[in-house]
Amino acid sequence: MHKWITFPHREGTCSRQAHADFPEQAIYEREAGRSGFFGPAAHFHHQHAPTGWSEWEGELRPRAFNFNHVEGVNALSPWQVPLLLHNHEVKVRVWKLEQAMPALARNADGDELLFIHQGKADLYCDYGHMVVSEGDYALIPRSTNWRLEPIEPLFILMIENTDAAYALPEKGLVGNHAVFDPAVLDVPSINDQFRAQYSEQQTQVQVKRHGQLSTITFPFNPLDAVGWHGDLSVVRLNWRDIRPLMSHRYHLPPSAHTTFVGQGFVVCTFVPRPIESDPGALKVPFYHNNDDYDEVLFYHAGDFFSRDNIEAGMVTFHPAGFTHGPHPKAFQAGLEYRKKFTDEVAVMIDTRHALQFSDAAQQVENRQYVYSWQSKVE
């Protein structure tokens, strides 16, 4: 049994409400919290930006990777591309595909979540056929047979929930239809296009189990179902179907934007929304120590209002153990309420256990990112 030691207390000069109405002499609020944004927290009011460091030594640091330039990601099989970020519960890769997959893929290690960063394709799987295109999540249950035939070249973010299954978040007070109605989730169809690919031709299935590949050969195409019933399926969700929670008086924590819940991590989606309009409300992400989680952000589209020099296809990685938050120009723009609407789209992965990054990721790292919070850095 675990019960936090909690006793709300005020000390010195502080605001009555988190993320709003800061003391004039200390406009930099820092949240130190436990269990993501669900545990006990303290809010400090600082005279200087908590990210105002002048030097940084050691391996623990904020990192940025340009996943547009990762080597070895152009492959005909998702199991041929390198791991980029990983722990025992989640595996993150990117994959570029321009030709039809010659074999079926099957992930026996866990559910696979594909986010289509670029392109369009026909997805064929045990459940039927559907088209996936830019902005789609395709959630593929563990051990499903599937393949892609690109209509346009694909750039895919892959997020494996190792030895576990994805679920939807509990929505609590706002109800089951908030953020997105489950009715917007699409499933594959046993349609004419699916039936047209029935064949007696030899077909291989590449199965990944314990990170190792086995190949099963059939004298026919195993995607030969004429129908199915049940409540397990591949599902598709586009970020444009997400209607974000918002408040004009309070900057909601990232957890309000949770899209899928994995074992040991969550996947959140940041989509365009109005910026807080109340004069006292914080209008950019707050400085925070998310001390129990590592944070990964994949930037998909738009103007990333809290970050400088970040483009689509890049990733920032903020491990637990230090404060992170908006860059100086973004913080100042928030104070001046320059923007009334965000137009960014990004995928966030918050992991309960520490992530490792691979050599393939390190090769595309911007080692100067740690100093991007310095006002002089362009």
From Swiss-Prot:
Keyword Metal-binding included in the entry's annotation: yes
Classification via Pfam families: HgmA_N
Superkingdom assignment: Bacteria
GO biological process: L-phenylalanine catabolic process; tyrosine metabolic process
Key words of the record: Dioxygenase, Iron, Metal-binding, Oxidoreductase
Listed GO MF terms: homogentisate 1,2-dioxygenase activity; metal ion binding
Family: Belongs to the homogentisate dioxygenase family.
Designated name of the protein: Putative dioxygenase VC_1345
Top-level taxonomy: Bacteria, Pseudomonadati, Pseudomonadota, Gammaproteobacteria, Vibrionales
